[in-house]
């Protein structure tokens, strides 16, 4: 099994964490988003939208795409440990928390959006950074509201073991740290994040611990 990723890609990081939690070995093929390698014809042949990640199965079948779909595939084919609760309401809550990040918050700060803001709309770097900070924290603030008031919250987003929600929330916090967001307004999120980082699968999947990651982060 192989997957296309990049140290800076938060979506690829979700898949990296899920693979590590499941104990599934997969080779990561780096596609440098900062150099536009995702736009080359050979990668577009794998993923026409030219985004990360993409998962290549050993049977040579059609590549899987979109991090959430890939993670649910992994959860179904490698059920231990489960990333979704057994009960329908629990699964819906976990998916909802995950989608606040993966579907509403993160897509607004990805490289193709930032590049459009810069090249087409001529928005300067400080304003682009402010843009990213806004959308990162809007998602985390919404998650905070759920986690702080709902009884299903435990050591993690849902109960006392990590789920799909924790995978997504942790990567959103990585992004918030990249853009120097003030995370003080989301203490429950940060408590859960710190709990996640005690787990090796999360810790070793940190973007800055991946090959090619710089010693000094730049936006």
Protein language model features and the residues they cover:
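Generic structural signal for helix capping and beta-alpha/helix-loop junctions
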Residues: 13, 36, 193, 213-214
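Short, hydrophobic secondary-structure boundary micro-motifs
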Residues: 81-86, 109-111, 154-159, 203-208
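Acidic/histidine-enriched, glycine/proline-rich intrinsically disordered or flexible terminal extensions
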Residues: 208-219
């Amino acid at each position: 099994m192989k997957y296309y990723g990049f140290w800076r890609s938060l979506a690829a990081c979700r898949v990296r964490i899920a693979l590590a939690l499941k104990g599934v070995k997969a080779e990561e093929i780096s596609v440098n988003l900062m150099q536009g390698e995702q736009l080359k014809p050979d990668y577009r042949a794998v993923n026409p939208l030219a985004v990360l990640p993409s998962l290549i199965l050993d049977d040579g079948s059609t590549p899987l795409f979109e991090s959430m779909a890939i993670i649910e595939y992994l959860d179904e084919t490698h059920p231990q440990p489960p990333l979704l609760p057994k009960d329908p309401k629990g699964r819906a809550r976990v998916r909802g928390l995950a989608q606040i990040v993966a579907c509403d918050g993160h897509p607004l700060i990805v490289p193709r959006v930032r590049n459009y803001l810069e090249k087409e709309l001529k928005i300067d770097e400080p304003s682009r950074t402010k843009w990213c900070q806004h959308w990162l924290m809007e998602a985390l603030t919404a998650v905070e509201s759920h986690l702080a008031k709902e009884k299903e919250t435990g050591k993690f987003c849902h109960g006392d073991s990590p789920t799909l929600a924790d995978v997504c929330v942790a990567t959103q916090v990585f992004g918030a740290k990249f853009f120097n967001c003030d995370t003080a307004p989301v203490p429950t999120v940060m408590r859960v994040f710190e709990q996640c980082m005690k787990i090796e699968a999360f810790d070793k999947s940190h973007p800055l611990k991946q090959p090619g990651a710089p010693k000094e982060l730049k936006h």
